[in-house]
């Protein structure tokens, strides 16, 4: 009876139904306890306990490895993000330097263009003044009779 209780009410923690011990327990009850069936049933129970123990040990190891892996993952992700930030900082610096250089070149070209335009206006004004000054007679324009005009 003790053997049947062990078989039918085994400590299988995973709450899965294992049919082999139940069938062997039923056959054992019907055959009045053969030694071979007892040995086979006890062997199966021992194997089942070993499997459940190893499963729980493997699960614990997986949890430990996952936590270490997650920690490593967090550090790796942090390093990756920092690397990307450094790369972006380099790219942004290069972009701003390029924009600054372009802006400086544009300002220089604008100032040169304005200066040339101003010089052209000044030279045009001088030329116009020279032409108008050479063509006109002061005496005729002023209407005054001066010693120079007489």
UniProtKB/Swiss-Prot annotation:
One of its GO terms (molecular function) is channel activity. The chain crosses the membrane at residues 16-44. Keywords: Activation of host autophagy by virus, Enterotoxin, Glycoprotein, Host endoplasmic reticulum, Host membrane, Host-virus interaction, Ion channel, Ion transport, Membrane, Secreted, Signal-anchor, Toxin, Transmembrane, Transmembrane helix, Transport, Viral ion channel, Virulence. Glycans are attached at residue 5. The N-glycosyl content is primarily Man(9)GlcNAc, with a small amount of Man(8)GlcNAc. The keyword Phosphoprotein does not apply. It is a single-pass type III membrane protein. Its main location: host cell. InterPro entries: Rotavirus_NSP4. Coiled coil: none annotated. The keyword Transmembrane applies. Residues 1-15 are lumenal. One of its GO terms (biological process) is symbiont-mediated activation of host autophagy. It comes from the Viruses. Residues 45-150 are cytoplasmic. It is found in: Host rough endoplasmic reticulum membrane; Host membrane, Host caveola; Secreted. One of its GO terms (cellular component) is membrane. Homotetramer. Interacts with the immature particle in the viroplasm. Interacts with host CAV1, early and late in infection. Interacts with host integrin ITGA1/ITGB1 heterodimer. Interacts with host integrin ITGA2/ITGB1 heterodimer. Interaction with microtubules blocks trafficking to the Golgi apparatus. HAMAP family: ROTA_NSP4 (MF_04091). Plays an essential role in the virus replication cycle by acting as a viroporin. Creates a pore in the host endoplasmic reticulum and as a consequence releases Ca(2+) in the cytoplasm of infected cell. In turn, high levels of cytoplasmic calcium trigger membrane trafficking and transport of viral ER-associated proteins to viroplasms, sites of viral genome replication and immature particle assembly. The secreted form acts as an enterotoxin that causes phospholipase C-dependent elevation of the intracellular calcium concentration in host intestinal mucosa cells. Increased concentration of intracellular calcium disrupts the cytoskeleton and the tight junctions, raising the paracellular permeability. Potentiates chloride ion secretion through a calcium ion-dependent signaling pathway, inducing age-dependent diarrhea. Belongs to the rotavirus NSP4 family. This is Non-structural glycoprotein 4.
């Amino acid at each position: 009876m003790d053997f049947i209780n062990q078989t039918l009410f085994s400590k299988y923690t995973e709450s899965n139904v294992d049919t082999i011990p139940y069938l062997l327990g039923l056959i054992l009850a019907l055959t009045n306890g053969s030694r071979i069936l007892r040995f086979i049933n006890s062997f199966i129970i021992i194997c089942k306990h070993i499997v459940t123990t190893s499963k729980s040990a493997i699960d614990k190891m997986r949890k430990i490895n996952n936590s270490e892996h997650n920690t490593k993952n967090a550090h790796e992700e942090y390093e990756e993000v920092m690397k990307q930030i450094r790369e972006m900082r380099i790219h942004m610096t290069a972009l701003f330097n390029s924009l600054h250089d372009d802006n400086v070149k544009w300002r220089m070209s604008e100032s040169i263009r304005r200066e040339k335009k101003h010089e052209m206006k000044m030279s045009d004004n001088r030329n116009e003044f020279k032409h108008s000054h050479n063509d006109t007679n002061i005496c005729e324009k002023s209407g005054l009779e001066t010693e120079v005009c007489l």
